[in-house]
Amino acid sequence: MKVLSLDLATKTGWAYNEPSINGGVWDLKPKRGSSEGMKQIKLRSMLQDFKNTVGKIDLIVYEKPAGRFMVGVISVAELVSVVKVFCEDEGIEYTSYRPTEIKKWATGKGNSNKVKMLEEARLRWPEINIIDDNMADAMLMLAMTQSDFVL
């Protein structure tokens, strides 16, 4: 099963498991003077380009929006809606995890900070240059999905 994992944010972490686990970060920050909607347009374009490059995607998994600051939660929720529409248009299954689920699975603690998650990802994949916590979260979420779906 080909799975794309997304940690949705202005700097969206992604991870993919075919032919072997790989990942990166997509910068969705709009250019100065652009509308805020450009973030959603960039995400849709990145998803389409990624699918065109890899071919088939069976499942997209993403982190559910959560947090204390409503503006950030709303921004991520808007990105989630882009992912859902993309999946519906392309016939791709999708699911999500709460941040605490991912943290507890990866570190044993549901309230682990970004540094701990980054350390955990680097321990699991020393051969991969994990550039930030967004990529780390996407990689760990992918591993969790593989474990849940026994891939």
Regions found by a protein language model. Give the residues of each.
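Phosphate- and other anionic-substrate recognition elements at nucleic-acid/protein interfaces
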Residues: M1-L151
